[in-house]
Amino acid sequence: FRSVELELARGSQIERRFLLPPGDGVAHYRYVVDLKANGGAVGPAAPRVSPAPAPRRAEKPLVVIDAGHGGRDPGASGAKVSESEVTLAAALALKAELERTGRYRVLLTRETNTYVDLYRRVAIARRADADLFISLHADAGTDPAVRGASVYTLSEQGAGRAVREFTRSDNWHRELHLPGRDPSVDRILLDMTQRATQNRSAQFARVLLTHLEASDHPLLRRSHRDAGLAVLLAPDVPAVLLEMGFITNPEDERLLTDERARRRLMRSVADGIDRYFREPAAALMTASNDGPAGQP
């Protein structure tokens, strides 16, 4: 059909309208129109109908944990260990924490000291239809006094790059289950999907930082940052990159290599994931008022 006509029991006007991409257990796009009454009723009030319950997701949320670097790419080096060793140990600890709750399915991009291409890491999450992607890393710097964790989400420039990368494929619209009849409409729907994903990523970043701070884990002063990192480019999977601390700082390296400290850190990350999935869907669709801070 090309049009829909509604007969309203009261005079009204459109207050706002917007498009919701697939998510929260709903596989199709939804066009939402909010109406505001103009005054008194012009006829008998319409019978009140209870809204149908939202479709419930049958499966547990799938969290993909990405242990940064690996194999021929050891990442940054500390006094005792390499970044790839630290990230794999943290990924395995986080997997154990999440599986212990019984509320999640968990998938690792690597489980051993192997090299995995950056774009393959993203493909693993997309192919599995992940609900959340978290990439674990350890920062490095020339000043050994600098320490603290930070969380990265996709920048606006990175979002543009993501769209360009994604639309190189001839059948990109099929990957997002778009109609494929009108390229301009599909592009709008892709942009809407990307925006919703960015909003969800920002929501998780804020929640995660709140839980890290509550656990007394040291944070950088500007702890929420943005960048066009390759592992954040999926247009339809909320994603963050967590720099757990500076491997070049003796105190941070100790926290990252001590088993008890690592388990405590991953428990706070798991708590953040728990809270993220408890947040109402409407909040996740709303753009953050607290955007990522710039670089120091």
Model features per residue range: what roles?
Residues 61-80:
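Short glycine-rich His-centered loop
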Residues 9, 21, 73, 289-292:
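Intrinsically disordered, low-complexity segments enriched in small/polar residues
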Residues 26, 36, 75, 184, ...:
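Intrinsic disorder/low-complexity detector
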Residues 13-17, 40-42, 74, 143, ...:
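Intrinsically disordered, low-complexity acidic/polar segments
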Residues 37-39, 69, 155-157:
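Short, flexible active-site-adjacent loop segments at beta-strand->alpha-helix junctions, enriched
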Residues 1-63:
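Signal-peptide-cleaved, periplasmic/extracellular N-terminal interaction regions immediately downstream
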Residues 6, 50-56, 60, 79-296:
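Active-site-proximal helix/loop segments of hydrolytic enzymes
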